From Swiss-Prot:
GO terms for molecular function: ATP binding; carbamate kinase activity. It holds the Pfam family AA_kinase. This is Carbamate kinase. CDD domains: AAK_CK. Keywords: Arginine metabolism, ATP-binding, Cytoplasm, Kinase, Nucleotide-binding, Transferase. One of its GO terms (cellular component) is cytosol. Gene3D superfamilies: Acetylglutamate kinase-like. It is an enzyme of class 2 (transferase). Its EC number is 2.7.2.2. Its main location: cytoplasm.
């Protein structure tokens, strides 16, 4: 079975945790221990987020004032290399030595006229108090937004249109490789007036890009791995309920928040609608049961309405 796994940012760095290389590697190791359990008899493609990492690089770059800060597309490429290296190494230590790995930088086409460029919504970097965020917004001309009980920098997040490296990914899978790609939603690019490909200052949502990746690869299963066991209605309330199975149409009517579960649900809907195959949102720690169809929230065209866990 060909499986595309979208690793949430929590798999690399837990909320509020210091953004050290040691912490990130430890979290990657924990994630890879789960992924290794489903490697036998499956083809694996791993995508991942990069919000905290790209924000950290932007902060580090801003601290060195002798040169202009590097643009977000370049920082995205840097994080894809760093995180891909960690996943490749840690997962490689858990599967047989002869299993090949490859991390591919993935350029993703976006529409330069996407409305997202005028409405930044994608959180990147560390969390701040309201006072810290307001000060940084003024100093650095950032857009900021609330993220839970804290605040973060937000940047444009245009929709992914095309993944340019999709053919090399297919070639690697055909040769038995585990592939890490579309890191951080891929590197946002567009064609200029001379039809030259250029990078652009943005961060693509990794779940939406991963859904496009899974669709392009004819994946049998698309897993969005996060830090909760399922998608919930009335989250955080005494009457919260975990969704077991839902049709794309039914779950789309629930209106999940754009800054949290919303993009994950939309990505799962996109994949299920386009392919007729299943997408599952669930905890990385449940990934074995997710593959067996026993855990997570499964979004599928094979059902009508919504079913909940007892």
């Amino acid at each position: 079975m060909r499986i595309v796994i979208a690793l949430g940012g929590n798999a690399l760095l837990r909320r509020g945790e210091p953004m050290t290389a040691e912490n990130q590697r430890q979290n990657v190791r924990i994630a890879c221990e789960q992924i290794a359990k489903i490697w036998p008899n499956n083809e694996l493609v791993i995508a991942h987020g990069n919000g905290p990492q790209v924000g950290l690089l932007a902060l580090q770059g801003a601290a060195y004032t002798d040169v202009p800060t590097y643009p977000l597309d370049v920082l995205g490429a840097e994080t894809a290399g760093m995180i891909g290296y960690m996943i490749q190494q840690e997962l490689g230590n858990l599967v047989p030595f002869e299993v090949p790995f490859a991390t591919l930088l993935s350029q993703v086409e976006v529409d330069i006229n996407d409305p997202a460029f005028k409405n930044p919504t994608k959180p990147i970097g560390p969390v701040y108090t309201k006072e810290e965020a307001e000060r940084l917004a003024k100093e650095k001309n950032w857009s900021i937004a609330q993220d839970g009980d804290k605040y973060r920098r937000v940047v444009p997040s245009p929709l992914p249109k095309r993944i340019f490296e999709i053919r090399p990914v297919k070639w690697l899978l055909e040769k038995g490789s585990i592939v890490i790609c579309a890191g951080g939603g891929g590197i946002p690019t567009y064609y200029d007036e001379h039809h030259n490909l250029q990078g652009v200052e943005a961060v693509i949502d990794k779940d939406l890009c991963s859904a496009l990746l899974a669709e392009n690869l004819d994946a049998d299963l698309f897993i969005i791995a996060t830090d909760v066991s399922a998608t919930f209605v009335d989250w955080g309330k005494p009457n919260q309920k975990a969704i077991s199975v839902a049709s794309p149409e039914a779950i789309s009517e629930l209106g999940f928040a754009s800054g949290s579960m919303g993009p994950k649900v939309q990505a799962a809907i996109n994949f299920a609608k386009q392919t007729g195959k299943d997408a599952v949102i669930g905890s990385l720690s449940d990934i074995v049961d997710i593959v067996k169809g026993k855990a997570g929230t499964r979004i599928t065209k094979k059902t009508e309405g919504i079913s909940y866990y007892a």
